[in-house]
C-alpha cells in the first residue's frame, strides 16, 4: 500500500506501522530528508536510493535507524545484528550481540597477595 502526499503532521508519518506500506513524504534536499526521517520517535530501519555512493554513505551515517539499506531493502543475515534506535527496540536480535539480552557482565578483582 502506498500513501502519497503524506505530511509529518499525519499519524501515519509519526507512528511505527508494519506491513507492506510506503508513506511518501516530499522533501527539498537531502538534509531536509534526513531531518524529516530523524524527527520521529522510532528508528527501526531506513532505506536510501542514490547513484552517488558518497551521498548514500553520508545519509546512512546521519539517519538514526538501527539498519540502513542502500539501493536495496530487506537484506538480512543471521550473523548481522538487527534492531532499532529510539522507541524501535531494545537490544539486538541475531548475531552474537543478541546474547547481550541474556547475559550480565561482571568484573571481580581479587588480591591474592
Task: Tell me what each language-model feature is.
Residues 1-113:
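Conserved C-terminal structural/oligomerization subdomain of aldehyde/semialdehyde dehydrogenase
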